[in-house]
Amino acid sequence: FEVTEKMIRHFVQKVHNNRKTLVRPRVLIAVPSGITQVEKRAVRDSAESAGAREVFLIEEPMAAAIGVDLPVQEPTGNMIIDIGGGTTEVAIISMSGIVFSRSIRIAGDEMNEAIVNYIKKKYNLLIGERTAEDVKIEIGSAYPMKKRMTMEVKGRDLVAGIPKTLIISDEEIREALTETFGTIVEAVKIALERTPPELAADIVDKGVVVAGGGSLIKGLDILLKEATGLPITLAEDPLSAVALGAGKV
C-alpha cells in the first residue's frame, strides 16, 4: 500500500513539475483484469492517500486495446494479448466491454527469473536480474531463428565463488523460457475456447493483436500463429499501448 502510494505521489508531482502547492488531480489507473475487489479498493485508497481527487480504474487489456486502436465500441470481436512485466492479460472485447478475460501472473519478470534459474542450474553461475533482462532482449526468442545468436554473460561462479564469463546461445534461452511461453499459449487457447461463436468468427478474420514489452520477444508472433492458426499482429508501440489507451479514455 505504502509503496503504491509513494509511486503515485511521485507521478503526480512529476506531472505538475514538483510544485509545492496542493494539487488534487483526477487519476486513471490501469489494473490487471484478474485482481480482486479488495485489491481494487487498495489501489483506490493508495491513489486517494497520494492526493487524488477522483480515482478511476480501467482494466489493462481494455486500455491496451484502445491504445492500439482496436474498434472496441463496435459489435464485433476483438482479441488483445498484453504481456507486461508482472502479468499477461488475454481478453476478448466487444461493444466497449470485456466479454472474457484471463489474467496470469506469468510475464516479463517471470521470464527473467526463468533465465536466472536456468543459467544457475546448468552452469552454476549466478547472474543478476538486470543481466537476465539484457539476455532476454538481446537473444531471447520464442521460435527458432534463422541465424544462431550468442551472448557473453558475466556472473559469479557458485562453486569457486569468483566472477566468471560464459557464452550462451539463443537456443538455451528458448529452452529456459519454454514453460513460460507454454503457459501464455495455454491462456490464449482457453480464451479462444470461451469466445462466443459469433465473436470467434470476427477474430478468425481480424486476428489477434499483441502488446506489452513481452511482445518484443523474437518469434513470439510465429509461435502464437502456429499455436492458434490465427493472424497475429504486433502493436506498433507495444510498451506504451496501455498508457496511450488510458490517455484516450
What does each of the following model-derived ranges do?
Residues 1-83, 91-209, 215-249:
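Nucleotide/phosphate-binding catalytic cleft detector across ATP-hydrolyzing
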